[in-house]
């Protein structure tokens, strides 16, 4: 098991302007330095907490296109909030080029890149993907620690999603086991919602029996007997 900072993304451009808070950042905005500042909640300008889907959809003219996804989105958000995870919509300046969202295993918050959330399908994919990482955090004993564990045996992940994750995260090979199932969950309606329900209801290991290695670790740490 390893600490994991997971993110997906698409292309963005760096404007030639100066933002407030930039003096805090050694590498400026659109960098991992900026992302770290956001994750630690030291940079909060243009970072707004999401209380319901309306907090996202209202930012765009085509807000009505988000409506079909409201039940699943709000259900996931409710489960996340129940276990102490907060979700934020943040300006693109806090994300390195190519990042659409990120879950932080230490603060237990995740952040959505406002620029890319204008498409409902992308919003749901990122919400499910990052939400799955929160569920992996829950699988590793408790949301309170900074560890994550795979939820399903790797061979149960359909080959399509395994290959996609191996390609997308080829430069982060240590992350691939976690990203395989997160990629699958990101594209599958209801999958993350179910896992977050299990986490919020204290039934994670009942609904998803731990893999042998995870069970061994959970037993060693005293989470299960």
Question: Can you say where each PLM-predicted feature lies in the sequence?
Answer:
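Cleavable N-terminal signal peptides
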Residues: 7-8, 18, 126
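Cleaved targeting-peptide boundary
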Residues: 19-29
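A mature extracytoplasmic/lumenal domain signature
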Residues: 91-93, 114-117, 138-141
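Short pre-active-site segment immediately N-terminal to the catalytic Zn-binding motif
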Residues: 110-127
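Catalytic Zn2+-binding segment of zinc metalloproteases
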Residues: 131-148
